[in-house]
Swiss-Prot record:
Domain of life: Bacteria
Similarity remark: Belongs to the metallo-dependent hydrolases superfamily. Uronate isomerase family.
EC primary class: isomerase
Enzyme Commission code: 5.3.1.12
Catalyzed reactions: D-glucuronate = D-fructuronate; aldehydo-D-galacturonate = keto-D-tagaturonate
UniProt-listed GO biological process terms: D-galacturonate catabolic process; D-glucuronate catabolic process
Short name of any one Pfam family annotated for the protein: UxaC
Transmembrane segment boundaries: none
PANTHER family, per database record: URONATE ISOMERASE (PTHR30068:SF4)
Biological pathway: Carbohydrate metabolism; pentose and glucuronate interconversion
Record-given protein name: Uronate isomerase
GO molecular function: glucuronate isomerase activity
Length: 467
């Protein structure tokens, strides 16, 4: 019987162990998509206690707590941090079988070095004091943890109207050698159907100093913000797409009419929504190309399902789930519309429903080219899929329908400074899969060849892709 989460956790073959320990383990982390607050990096936040760094804003843990019957007061309510922490300690033993159980223990091991005890009510007080003592030390500040975890770059997620003042402050600080770059997230612009669209355009108009009455005005305002983001080191644009729409792009006069209807709070037809979003996205893609940005699309979530809790807590509080809309055809047409004028940028497609894995893995092959290795990527298992089975499925299906060797690898997609251990989880799963191929005679026992492939997937490919 193997020990629980020992140094060879998830590694069952000799080849897998060699690939992980000699090639994957010590590669730096290139975390090209996350939701860290750049202010916390700029100000080098020192966390007061373990609950603050561990439970604050982590909707994965919040969902587990609710499922275990913990009152909301002890999750997002006014209970003390220690009370919330104890509720988490009681919940974790109930999570066996869920990746949260593994993540929790990985997060205690790195960076805190706690390897000799399980997280449960019996050990909770000891772990609390031990970790809190470390959290008061400079090397366990926000920046300190990033450095301990060997992070080289993080790409945050930022609205076009964000000031990016904290990115600028980090960039100007020569004492800190980790790149923290913004990523453009224009969801509130291309989703004309959102109730807050008009209010958002007022904000965009103010920050860009452009009156927005026409489609040309909107592009002018966005162009100013694109240039500003580019000057701040932006390398990527991300798009949350609950629905993938496509319609032939009409004349600009039609787009002006659609925009005017929306500004006057008149209801739009679904066709008009699709025409507008297609026009904006295709134009944005051409601008990304000019700046050599990567375009990311996160497809298929159903957000804010629980209207009562949304009213209480707002978005990103643990009430989202997997959607099941069919979108292969509109996605194909949208990418093709971008590609027709050779204005399809490097692109990463993520699907939330694993049903769509093979569809996405085959779709990316339609638009490869331009002498760019892995120009169009099937993104790593996202959200509900960034667990063992989900990662294995994505890796296997990418390898079967594409080129695994060109994959840009893992990302945290997280708001937590402790989530870098997800890269370790991914790397172990990757090495186990490839090591298994060798043991079964399905891949050559050429460690130098496979080791380079592992190093590329863990770091080198992403570094080269996000230039």
């Amino acid at each position: 019987m193997k020990s629980f989460m020992d140094e060879n956790f998830l590694l069952s073959t000799d080849t897998a162990k060699i690939l992980y320990h000699d090639y994957a383990k010590n590669k730096p982390i290139f975390d090209y998509h996350c939701h860290l607050n750049p202010r916390e990096v700029a100000e080098n936040r020192q966390f007061n206690d373990l609950a603050e760094i561990w439970l604050e804003g982590d909707h994965y843990k919040w969902r587990a707590l609710r499922t275990a019957g913990v009152p909301e007061e002890l999750i997002t309510g006014k209970a003390t941090n220690y009370q919330k922490y104890l509720a988490w300690a009681k919940t974790v033993p109930l999570c066996i079988g869920n990746p949260i159980y593994h993540w929790t223990h990985l997060e205690l091991r790195r960076p805190f070095g706690i390897t000799n005890m399980l997280f449960n009510p019996q050990n909770a007080e000891k772990i609390w004091h031990q970790c809190n003592e470390m959290l008061q030390q400079p090397e366990f500040s926000a920046r300190g943890i990033m450095q301990k975890m060997n992070v080289k770059l993080v790409g945050t997620t930022d609205d076009p109207i964000d000031s990016l003042q904290y990115h600028q402050a980090i960039k100007n600080d020569e004492s800190f050698d980790i790149d923290v770059v913004p990523s453009w997230r224009p969801d509130k612009v291309f989703k004309i159907e959102l109730p807050q669209f008009n209010d958002y355009l007022v904000q965009l108009s103010e920050i860009a100093d452009v009156d927005i009455y026409t489609f040309a005005d909107l592009k002018k305002a966005l162009l100013k913000r694109l240039e500003y983001f580019d000057a701040q080191g932006c390398k990527s644009a991300d798009h949350g797409m609950e629905i993938v729409r496509f319609s032939a792009i009409p004349d600009e006069s039609v787009l002006n009419s659609i925009l005017q209807k929306r500004l006057q709070n008149q209801p739009l037809l679904e066709e008009e929504v699709a025409q507008f979003s297609t026009a904006i996205l295709v134009w944005l893609a051409s601008e990304y190309c000019k700046r050599h940005w990567v375009m990311q699309m996160h497809i298929g979530a159903i957000r804010n399902n629980n209207s009562r809790m949304f009213a209480l807590l707002g978005a990103d509080s643990g009430f989202d789930s997997i959607g099941d809309r069919a979108y292969a055809y509109p996605l194909s047409r949208l990418l093709d519309a971008m590609d027709k004028e050779n204005q399809l940028p490097k692109t990463i497609l993520y699907c939330l429903n694993p049903r769509d894995n093979e569809m996405i893995a085959s779709m990316i092959g339609n638009f490869q080219g331009d002498g760019i290795a892995g120009k169009i990527q099937f993104g790593s298992g996202w959200w509900f899929n960034d667990q063992k089975d989900g990662m294995e499925r994505q890796l296997q299906q990418l390898s079967q329908l594409g080129l695994l060797s060109q994959f840009v690898g893992m990302l945290t997609d997280s708001r937590s400074f402790l989530s870098y251990t997800r890269h370790e989880y991914f790397r172990r799963i990757l090495c186990e899969m490839i090591g298994g191929w060798v043991e079964k005679g399905e891949a050559p026992n050429d460690i130098s060849l496979l080791g380079k492939m592992i190093e590329d997937i863990c770091f080198n490919n992403a570094k080269n892709y996000f230039k």
